[in-house]
Amino acid sequence: MQYRKLRVIISGGGTGGHIFPALSIAGCLKSLNPETEILFVGAKGRMEMEKVPAAGYKIVGLEISGLRRSLSLENLKLPFRLLSSIRKAKRLIREFRPDIAIGVGGYASAPLLRAAQSLGVPTLIQEQNGFAGLANKMLARKAGRICVAYEGMERFFPADRIVMTGNPIRSEIVPADGKMREEALNFYGLDGSRRQLLIVGGSLGSR
């Protein structure tokens, strides 16, 4: 089967909660269309600069950082870093010529998607949480589609552009078969006759 070559920029990161859904999206796009060319854009010095290349994708870093909630002189640098990052993002977009730009949240996605929107590139946002992040709320105003995992997200985003997709899951996370379940029960000393519930903490607070 012949596929049209697609060019996709995926931007966001800072924590695994943004990075791993982004990698899941990239993997799904590749499985649907092997000709898809994907470029990641993240923040220099953050987790995505290691995780994305390890997964086999190219990534470009921007000199951008998040807004500190406490009083800090670093916040004075933020407007200049943002403008510089938007300029670099525009250059990347002109060179790569994407068909679409996808933002997965986090401050790293803001310059890239803002640049894409200003250049007329279609944009899509993926929001993993039940409470939308600041970057996604700002970018949603001009996004073509907003993919969400929970009901009630119209309190953050325009209802007519919301698509309920659930959260992207990596292909390597597979349903446990009987043998795997038995091994887990033995390892944790659990009673196999009872239902088991796994609770996993999220983001940096899970420590």
What does each model-identified segment do?
Residues 1-6, 52, 178-199:
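Nucleotide-sugar donor-binding and catalytic loop/hinge architecture
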